[in-house]
Amino acid sequence: MEDFVRQCFNPMVVELAEKAMKEYGEDLKIETNKFAAICTHLEVCFMYSDFHFINEQGESIVVELDDPNALLKHRFEIIEGRDRTMAWTVVNSICNTTGAEKPKFLPDLYDYKENRFIEIGVTRREVHIYYLEKANKIKSENTHIHIFSFTGEEMATKADYTLDEESRARIKTRLFTIRQEMANRGLWDSFRQSERGEETIEERFEITGTMRRLADQSLPPNFSCLENFRAYVDGFEPNGCIEGKLSQMSKEVNAKIEPFLKTTPRPIKLPDGPPCFQRSKFLLMDALKLSIEDPSHEGEGIPLYDAIKCMRTFFGWKEPYIVKPHEKGINPNYLLSWKQVLAELQDIENEEKIPRTKNMKKTSQLKWALGENMAPEKVDFDNCRDISDLRQYDSDEPELRSLSSWIQNEFNKACELTDSIWIELDEIGEDVAPIEYIASMRRNYFTAEVSHCRATEYIMKGVYINTALLNASCAAMDDFQLIPMISKCRTKEGRRKTNLYGFIIKGRSHLRNDTDVVNFVSMEFSLTDPRLEPHKWEKYCVLEIGDMLLRSAIGQMSRPMFLYVRTNGTSKIKMKWGMEMRRCLLQSLQQIESMIEAESSVKEKDMTKEFFENKSETWPIGESPKGVEEGSIGKVCRTLLAKSVFNSLYASPQLEGFSAESRKLLLVVQALRDNLEPGTFDLGGLYEAIEECLINDPWVLLNASWFNSFLTHALR
């Protein structure tokens, strides 16, 4: 078909058709029938206009090309074949000079004699069906429609055919010739059917009776019958101008497209209020580990055994006391809960055989901390129908919080390297295909860059805690089970290491639905003094529980050891996703891989090795108030991983909403940077949608602040 088109049509027509297909992202090598259809339509538009002029008296005359009077005014302005921007410029100019109403869709011609736009149609089907589709799409009495078919039929608005019979006969003859030439080459059947794809069951199967009535009843408003709606859908052009598309959708929609310029966007407004607080399920940069190297004790691998062994490595325990109370809680209960944990661990050690699990005594302090008997009684709705003032209980609007510097510090820390290895290289058999070889090479390079990263530690810690808590919630539903918070890693020298961060005590956990909540109390070791950033620890009661000797360059020094205690809650679905935090590694690897692919396609060879081994090259990491931050490929890997991990740790409806809405603004800004001249409508509504997600979540507030930095530097 492509060869036929190039032989059959004028090279100028072919070139214009190629440009049109490129503009709409279509491949003429694949869409060959469409290529032929565009060329045919262009040629008919040119033939419609050819030889038609207006003389000094304003009459329409037909003049051959070699006639000396060819300088007369052309009767028709050709709009089809121009690029969209130029075509709309011509249409606007005509409307301004003639007073014609601006069409919603680009027409093909303008007739200066009749003062009207013309839409030309060339169809391989019945002319009246195609005419109906065009009329339904355009919905304008000011645009004249003229349809030609390959069988010599034609149809025009009000049977007004505009041209003289000889000019129309020339067009019909040309279309018939094209059909014959296609048929001779065996191309016609495919071309004829491609206008609406292959023949469908609906075309052969008449809908009647009840189904027909149901179809007519199910139509959207403003459609009287199924045929009208079908014609409208078939004539709906996805790449038409936006205003036209909107007006097609509903008569009530009247969007004015505003140009989006460098001066258009304003910064996102962050909320005012007290500073935001830490809301992760476990401590991040402030966590302290009690560790044992090369564990070989009896029961190694059983969490309770490992925890007791780690506790024995510390000798600086002292009488605990509260250094930062929780403003709304009964703080002595938190203190008593920690003392109870110490006492019950001591009881275990005195036993002959250490049990595999430990259920805490149901003391008053634990009952309070775990919300035992605090839930309102559930009553069957049927028993309440007669209560006159039955209503849902009032809930307060969340208090707005401002961005605080601690969350940026947390993120920076998550990107850093630790002195331990948190993930192993997977043992995989021999590669059998080149693609597997490249994939495993990329994975190995990536693993080497992130295996020491603190964000990877958070992944392993999160996986362990969520797995242990979900298991205990199912296995010991009524018990207050003590769950050690443990992780495992290797030292740089390859020695195994078991770490204890603290303990969790689980409350009652009859979790029937995914969203049913299990309460727990977390008790985590730390060297961070909470009085330095009290706002960060709003939800915590912090105890001082010991003194730790630390080795430094100037010798040994003693630092107070703190215990961060809080009541928290989670659900089956949250624990299920927490158990799958390793997915963060995969997500960030895929992002790195897309960067490698982009580089490889430019260089036309796989660039994996160069990408990771060229240590001198820097890559953009993100935006800050200083501008675009750059770093090594390893830093890029760790930053992408940290972002993915924080999306998991701080998952919330606020984050979902902000990500979805800010992405729309981001795409418009990127279109502006790419000189695509974007337009917007209701930009204020988009800002409103973004800003209603900025309430109190620290990670969302930080992302909004980063977005503002991006706006500042992107639009310079």
From Swiss-Prot:
Cofactor: Mn(2+)
Cofactor, how bound (note): Binds 2 manganese ions per subunit.
Extent of motif Nuclear localization signal 1 (NLS1): 124-139
Main localization category: host cell
Motif Nuclear localization signal 2 (NLS2): chain residues: 184-247
Keyword Phosphoprotein: yes
Transmembrane segments: none
A cellular component annotation (GO) from this entry: host cell cytoplasm
Annotated EC: 3.1.-.-
Residue runs in coiled coils: none
Superkingdom of this protein's organism: Viruses
Family note: Belongs to the influenza viruses PA family.
Assembly behavior: Influenza RNA polymerase is composed of three subunits: PB1, PB2 and PA. Interacts (via C-terminus) with PB1 (via N-terminus).
Name the record gives this protein: Polymerase acidic protein
The organism of origin for this protein: Influenza A virus (strain A/Port Chalmers/1/1973 H3N2)
